[in-house]
Amino acid sequence: MAMEVGEMSQPEATASLLSLASATQQPYVSELLSFTLDRLHKEPELLRVDAERIQRQMQEVAVGNYRAFITAADALLAIRQEVSSIDKHLESLIGEVPKLTSGCTEFIDSAENILEKRKMNQALLANHSTLLDLLEIPQLMDTCVRNGNFDEALDLEAFVSKLATLHPKLPVIQALAAEVRQTTQSLLSQLLQKLRSNIQLPECLRIIGYLRRIGVFGEYEMRLQFLRCREAWLTGILEDLDQKNAYEYLKGMINCHRMHLFDVVNQYRAIFSDDTSGSEENYDGGLLFSWAMHQITSHLKTLKIMLPKITEGGSLSNILDQCMYCAMGLGGVGLDFRGLLPPLFEEAVLNLFSKNMSTAVENFQLVLDSHRWVPLPSVGFPSSGINEDSKDDVTPPSYLMEHPPLAVFINGVSSALNELRPCAPLSLKNVVAHELIKGLQAVSDSLLRYNTTRMLRLSESNLFLSLCRAFVEVVFPHCATCFGRCYPGGATIVMDAKSAYEGLGRILAASSSQEPSNKSPKVISTDTKDASENGVASQPEEKQAENPNAKEEDNSPIPLQTPEITPES
């Protein structure tokens, strides 16, 4: 029964034992299960014996290897201490790892930046010469401008403008473009300054071509700028002239306009086209015409201001000739202004003649006021009388030398007419005649006032009456004759103005009625002059020798030969 129980429970017991045994113990347990009961009863003893044997062996080994055990124990202790230290350092390392990671990241970023800069430096080194050429463009362009190499300068400007368009965000390129723009402004100023100088058409064409390449001005603005610069050049020439000398200034101004104004108009027409069939901006809208009219107007205004300052008729005539020549030359470009000149010169001629006549009257008055009424030596007279003289001979009668005030007046009138003859406008014939008559009237009025305000002795009164008679019978006709030499038929106009000496005529008529007829003074005589008229003994008359050169051509000046007054030529 017990055997059956044991036999029946053996598999289960074996399974339970095997499940309790470890992997290293399972072979031994399996071996135990295979033993018999007797063998199993002996097994504890056998195990005890083996244990004792092993213990003895261990003791022997321990005795024989105690140093190794001590060393191992020391090593184990040291290892424990080191492991503990390593554990602490490991924890510290774990705490520092994030910092290390961050540092590595920063290093990587810095290294990348350095690498990037290195690449840039390498690229810069590889393109050093090209970049140097680019950076030297402003300096090179400035040198070209200073040396007059405008084509090369404009090529550089176009290249930099293209670079600035392609790389608008690069600061270096923009700075380069800014410097080039400054140099371009200098180039523009230099080109405009050249337009303000004395240059010919080929140079003008080159400069306008450069201005078009720069592109600062539109077509209309460029035309306007061209005319402004050329006007500034003309103004500079006129400013260099001496304005103190009106004659020389006008000569220089007329020559300037005659030569240079003609050139400027031709240059403008050659450079710019006025074809209205093209683009509207190519049409100047009468810009050249307006500018030319401005120049002509300025020319005429200057003439109007400066002509009254000319005091010689010959100079006035020369200015008129030059103005006519200038206007005729400018007529080739449509600027003939000859029709505008007569009023200016008529006014100047009239002013000059009026001034000279006023001077003659003033000088007469001065000499008359200071004149001492003493008889002067008589001189020879023409045998045939005043009215029978040659019509071409306008030499003042020598009889007038006995009357210094009249001689001075005749000198002044001759001077005025001599200044008038080179430039005597026919339209002023009556006006000039009126001025001459007005001067004669002023002399007559002066003599009347003198007669009224002065108390003269008998001898002085006779001399005064002789002077008045000489004025009426000699001076007045002589002035009319001289005026007729300037204006054909003008003598009649003057002679018809008898009202100028009516007062003197009445005085002379009254004096003649009071004196015996045989003692009345005669202005022109072939025998003798009355002693009461001269205050000296009568002297025989000598017939004046005729000078073969006395007869002059129509264009010759009117001479006055008196020893008291220097003749005016």
From Swiss-Prot:
It comes from the Eukaryota. Disruption phenotype: Male-specific transmission defect due to incorrect deposition of cell wall components and proteins during pollen tube elongation, thus leading to disrupted pollen tube growth. Embryo- and seedling-lethal associated with white seeds in siliques, delayed embryo development from the early stages, arrested at heart stages and resulting in abnormal curled cotyledons. Altered Golgi bodies morphology. Impaired Gamma-COP and TMN1/EMP12 tight association with the Golgi. The keyword Chaperone does not apply. GO terms for cellular component: Golgi membrane; Golgi transport complex; plasmodesma. Residues 511-526 have a biased composition (Polar residues). InterPro entries: COG8, COG8_Metazoal_Plant, Cullin_repeat-like_dom_sf. It is a peripheral membrane protein. Residues 511-569 are annotated as: Disordered. GO terms for biological process: Golgi organization; Golgi vesicle transport; pollen tube growth; protein transport. Residues 540-554 have a biased composition (Basic and acidic residues). It is found in: Golgi apparatus membrane. Signal peptide: none annotated. GO terms for molecular function: protein homodimerization activity. Keywords: Golgi apparatus, Membrane, Protein transport, Transport. Homodimer. Component of the conserved oligomeric Golgi complex which is composed of eight different subunits and is required for normal Golgi morphology and localization. Interacts with COG1, COG3, COG5 and COG6. Acts as a component of the peripheral membrane COG complex that is involved in intra-Golgi protein trafficking. Involved in pollen tube growth by modulating Golgi morphology and vesicle trafficking homeostasis leading to the deposition of cell wall components and proteins at the pollen tube tip. Required for sporophytic development. Belongs to the COG8 family. This is Conserved oligomeric Golgi complex subunit 8.
